[in-house]
């Protein structure tokens, strides 16, 4: 009922920009440009958790974009879903286009957007599942622009987890380790297309790494291919001790995780988010 009422009021009541408060518009041109006006980039946390797939982000998590994501997630600004879905779709396209010889929508068949699941208590408190909602909008935008796509909401939490807010990178990894699983029958669905994990935001990468682990595990069980992801596949230099994310400046080798996803799924696992920390987009502008 709450979600239905919010949808109705979004259509009937006078709107203001959810990013800056400008009157008579759900999203003003300036805030739309902040959300969708950049070329999506590859980003990665520092330090990088083992097993994290290649991640592309559409926008920096700063100012207007932060406000928009929080308005949609926490305040039920559902009228933003379409624009947020467009931004997520752009990040998905960037990841598919960077896949090498099989890059491009035509080489992938159907794209399966797999949302990182929210905790059940969070969905109840918010009255909706924001990431799944944005994934559905992104799939619609991809189809509209010629890429076959659909949402495969096959991940669920297998145990309760603490609120990630306030936890550092190690704490988030420990909190989420082994927390996700693929639903019964979900493995069969994952074999029907090119899997792209989707979330609203990347900070430490713990959520996406755990989602990737769950997807790889079920894919390997179905294919009979088993590989081990070692913590040593992460890389952290002396000048990279803080937690953040940045665009890729050199080719890094992902051994076990990338080979596992490629062998078992038949393609390299990818991930896309709407936003990543600001420095991800400032450290590499070429």
Where are these regions (language model features)?
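Glycine-rich phosphate/pyrophosphate-handling loop used in enzymes and phosphotransfer proteins
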Residues: 1-286
């Amino acid at each position: 009922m709450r979600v239905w009422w919010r949808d109705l009021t979004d259509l009937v009541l006078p709107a203001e920009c959810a990013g800056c408060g400008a009157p008579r518009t759900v999203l003003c041109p300036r805030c739309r440009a902040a959300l969708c006006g950049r070329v999506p980039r590859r980003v990665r946390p520092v330090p990088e958790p083992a097993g994290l797939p290649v991640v592309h982000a559409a926008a920096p998590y700063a100012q207007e974009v932060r406000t928009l994501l929080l308005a949609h997630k926490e305040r039920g600004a559902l009228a933003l879903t379409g624009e947020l879905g467009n931004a997520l779709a752009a990040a998905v396209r960037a990841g598919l286009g960077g896949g090498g010889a099989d890059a491009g929508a035509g080489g992938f068949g159907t794209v399966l957007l797999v949302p990182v699941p929210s905790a059940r208590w969070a969905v109840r408190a918010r009255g909706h599942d924001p990431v799944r909602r944005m994934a559905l909008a992104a799939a619609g935008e991809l189809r509209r622009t010629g890429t076959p796509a659909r949402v495969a909401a096959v991940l669920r939490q297998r145990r309760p987890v603490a609120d990630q807010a306030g936890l550092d990178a190690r704490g988030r990894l420990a909190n989420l380790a082994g927390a996700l699983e693929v639903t019964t029958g979900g493995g069969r669905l994952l074999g029907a297309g090119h899997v792209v994990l989707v979330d609203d935001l990347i900070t430490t990468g713990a959520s996406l790494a755990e989602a990737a682990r769950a997807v790889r595990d079920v894919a390997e069980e179905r294919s009979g291919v088993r590989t081990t992801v070692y913590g040593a596949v992460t890389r952290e230099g002396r000048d990279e001790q803080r937690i953040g994310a940045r665009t890729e400046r050199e080719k890094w080798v992902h051994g076990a995780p990338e080979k596992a996803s490629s062998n078992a799924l038949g393609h390299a696992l990818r991930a896309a988010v709407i936003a990543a920390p600001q420095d991800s987009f400032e450290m590499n502008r070429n």
